[in-house]
Design a protein with these regions (language model features):
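C-terminal effector/interaction modules appended to NTPase cores
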Residues: 1-100
Length: 100
């Protein structure tokens, strides 16, 4: 069974604004932060199919978010147009929007 995905646009905060210190790879399937919509539950996923080069703090990019815990986790909040926070632990490292 193939896992479901949503396409997201992510903008990382700069380190000075409380974001990451290093660039994140959105293409290799190794970056696994959480999404949170409007203060809701943390939603786990893995990012892939993003740009070949890692995305630097302060930059933005599109990638596919693989809903790795479905069906055990409900991802229904991730609908087209919804805005979200990108978290590493409790730290909000970026913002995003579901595109498809």
């Amino acid at each position: 069974m193939q896992q479901k995905t949503v396409t997201v646009q992510i903008r990382f905060k700069t380190e000075a604004d409380g974001g990451r210190a290093m660039a994140a790879s959105l293409c290799s399937g190794t970056y696994r932060p959480h999404f949170r919509v409007s203060g809701g539950e943390y939603l786990g996923f893995v990012l892939c199919n993003g740009p070949a080069d890692a995305v630097a703090p302060g930059a933005s990019a599109c990638a596919d978010a693989v809903l790795i815990y479905e069906p055990d986790v409900v991802y229904s909040a991730l609908t087209r147009g919804v805005e979200l926070n990108v978290l590493e632990g409790r730290q909000v490292v970026g913002t995003g929007k579901v595109l498809a």
